[in-house]
Amino acid sequence: MKPNFSKGLLPAVVIEEDTKEVLMLAYMNEEAYEKTIETKRTWFYSRSRRSLWNKGETSGNVQHVQSLYLDCDQDSIVVVVKQVGPACHTGEKTCFHYKII
């Protein structure tokens, strides 16, 4: 089974394998998805820069892909990783560090 990229970018929720903590949300196009499978590292599509980016390529905070899950509609992805360093560009462990309720 493969993701359905016919409507464009798909959301990719990245979680830590050991803790199941949500680390970040990013978007994948088909090329990012294929590179993620090929390299076992996360690749995403930047909507602002309109280009691919490899998580941790600059910072060293890489994500080693352990598994990928596809939802029932084939239009969103869960990426299970072993995170090296913080996932957020702010230096926080997760991008979801602002508690609302």
UniProtKB/Swiss-Prot annotation:
Biological processes, Gene Ontology terms: L-histidine biosynthetic process
Catalysis performed (reactions): 1-(5-phospho-beta-D-ribosyl)-5'-AMP + H2O = 1-(5-phospho-beta-D-ribosyl)-5-[(5-phospho-beta-D-ribosylamino)methylideneamino]imidazole-4-carboxamide
Keywords of this entry: Amino-acid biosynthesis, Cytoplasm, Histidine biosynthesis, Hydrolase, Magnesium, Metal-binding, Zinc
Coiled coil location: none
Binding site for Mg(2+): 71, 73, 75
Top-level taxon: Bacteria
Record text on cofactor binding: Binds 1 Mg(2+) ion per subunit. Binds 1 zinc ion per subunit.
The protein's required cofactors: Mg(2+); Zn(2+)
Assigned EC number: 3.5.4.19
GO molecular function list: magnesium ion binding; phosphoribosyl-AMP cyclohydrolase activity; zinc ion binding
Role played: Catalyzes the hydrolysis of the adenine ring of phosphoribosyl-AMP.
UniProt-recorded name of the protein: Phosphoribosyl-AMP cyclohydrolase
Provenance organism: Bacillus cereus (strain ATCC 10987 / NRS 248)
Highest classification ranks of the organism: Bacteria, Bacillati, Bacillota, Bacilli, Bacillales
Gene encoding the protein: hisI
